[in-house]
Swiss-Prot record:
Belongs to the class-II aminoacyl-tRNA synthetase family. It catalyses: tRNA(His) + L-histidine + ATP = L-histidyl-tRNA(His) + AMP + diphosphate + H(+). It holds the Pfam family tRNA-synt_His. It comes from the Bacteria. Its EC number is 6.1.1.21. GO terms for biological process: histidyl-tRNA aminoacylation. Homodimer. Disulfide bonds: none annotated. Keywords: Aminoacyl-tRNA synthetase, ATP-binding, Cytoplasm, Ligase, Nucleotide-binding, Protein biosynthesis. This is Histidine--tRNA ligase. It is found in: Cytoplasm. PANTHER family: HISTIDINE--TRNA LIGASE, MITOCHONDRIAL-RELATED (PTHR43707:SF1), HISTIDYL-TRNA SYNTHETASE (PTHR43707).
Length: 423
């Protein structure tokens, strides 16, 4: 038997309704913030991620699914969404459209070769937003408010917003030099990844899963001590907006994002449930990127965004015992008796469905009792039984499956009857 690839999952019908509910809710929220959907290819040129995500990142070095196509071009299944959205922004000259900043959101599968664990998959579904064209602390605050709005709209309460400023390019340069001086004397005691990052991306040493508990990491210089006046002022204004919005947050000077393109504001949304088993910690992450567009040969524009995993959102809802208001019923199940009724039901079903009425019937020639059980299993709100007598008299009984009550109506009025019920 051929089995599903490791690190992937089948989303079965009983779960896909939850996914559709979440995706519909996210679409509705995006309209409130005036964000428009964008869809990019599942695969892109490998160079896009090497340049846009960063050669020194774990994503590029260890986790990408890369292959050569028949034209000998290096192609990669997208490991994240931002680089592709920015590529599309540049290629389609969106900086020239009248509505600025350009507010975009996306939702789709991403691919990373990661170790299988709860809440993490090698194919996962990422929802994200990107606001490009405005370097304004109020935009950063809006994006952070949107993050909180999303999770709170699903009923999650045990949330902790963690923020930091990585500063501008000048601040980061000075800070990276300080980190190199700090870690060089002890780098031999660190893992191979940290050793390779010391002179390429020393900030990543701070969030190394292997060495983050070392004293040298705990006592490392803090980015807040190296922010220039402009970076400090920007971050302070972001925090002022958050205070005005009543959004609680925690500052963590060691918070750095795993991708190279972040500047200024960086953030993560964490689980903060005392009963949580620790299987996942971070629900969502993002930040500002002020140099990414130029890095990809685009205009001198700034952006900010975030991404979240639908799988992790579902896991968080499960851990907090939150049931989604998923509609799993349909309007009508037709029970048939005899060949004439079976033939008539095919025509009737077609009329019902074309009129917007969710309806179904038996296809396995069950007896009436078995058909009624099937209607109950399918959560049909109503059933009708059609046999020779009903066809001859053109009268049927509509049964309410929740109350057991019946109502007798003209068979030819069945479509109108349910249209009126649905209005």
């Amino acid at each position: 038997m051929i089995r599903i690839p490791r690190g992937t999952q089948d989303i079965l019908p009983e779960d896909s309704s939850k996914w559709r509910y979440i995706e519909n809710q996210l679409d509705k929220l995006m309209k409130l913030y005036n964000y428009k959907e964008i869809r990019t290819p599942i695969f892109e040129s490998t160079d896009l991620f090497a340049r846009g995500v960063g050669d020194s990142t774990d994503v590029v070095q260890k986790e990408m699914y890369t292959f050569k196509d028949k034209g000998d071009r290096s192609i990669t299944l997208r490991p994240e969404g931002t680089a592709a959205v920015v590529r599309s922004y540049i290629e389609n000259k969106m900086q020239g459209i009248p509505n600025q900043p350009v507010k975009l959101y996306y939702n789709g599968p991403m691919f990373r070769y990661e170790r299988k664990q709860k809440g993490r998959y090698r194919q996962f579904t990422q929802f994200g937003v990107e606001a490009i064209g405005a370097e304004n602390p109020s935009m950063d605050a809006e994006v952070l408010a949107m993050v909180m709005h999303i999770y709170e709209s699903f009923g999650l309460k045990h949330l902790k917003l963690v923020i930091n400023s990585i500063g501008d390019a000048d601040s980061r340069k000075e800070y990276n030099e300080a980190l190199i001086r700090h870690f060089e004397p002890v780098i031999d005691t660190f893992c191979d990844d940290c050793k390779s990052r010391l002179h390429t991306n020393p900030m990543r040493i701070l969030d190394c899963k292997i060495d983050r508990d070392k004293e040298a990491v705990k006592n490392a210089p803090r980015i807040t001590d190296y922010l220039n006046d402009d970076s400090k002022a920007y971050f302070n204004e972001v925090k002022t907006h958050l205070d005005d919005l009543g959004i609680s947050y925690v500052e963590d000077p060691n918070l750095v994002r795993g991708l190279d393109y972040y500047t200024h504001t960086a953030f993560e949304l964490m689980m903060d449930n005392p009963n949580y088993d620790g299987a996942i910690t971070t629900l969502c992450g993002g930040g500002r990127y002020n140099g990414l567009l130029e890095l990809l040969d685009g205009p001198n524009q700034t952006g900010i965004g975030f991404a979240l995993s639908i799988e992790r959102l579902l896991l968080a809802l499960e851990e907090e015992g939150i049931e989604l208001d998923v509609e799993d019923t349909f309007d009508l199940f037709i029970v048939t008796m005899g060949e004439e009724a079976e033939r008539y039901s095919v025509k009737l079903l077609n009329q019902l469905r074309k009129s917007g009425i969710k309806a179904d019937k038996d296809y396995l020639q069950r007896k009436v009792k078995g058909q009624m059980k099937q209607a109950d299993r399918l959560n049909a709100q109503y059933t009708v039984v059609i046999g020779d007598q009903e066809l001859e008299n053109e009268v049927i009984d509509v049964k309410d499956m929740s109350t057991g009550e019946t109502e007798t109506i003209n068979l030819n009025n069945l479509v109108n009857y349910f249209q009126e019920k649905n209005n």
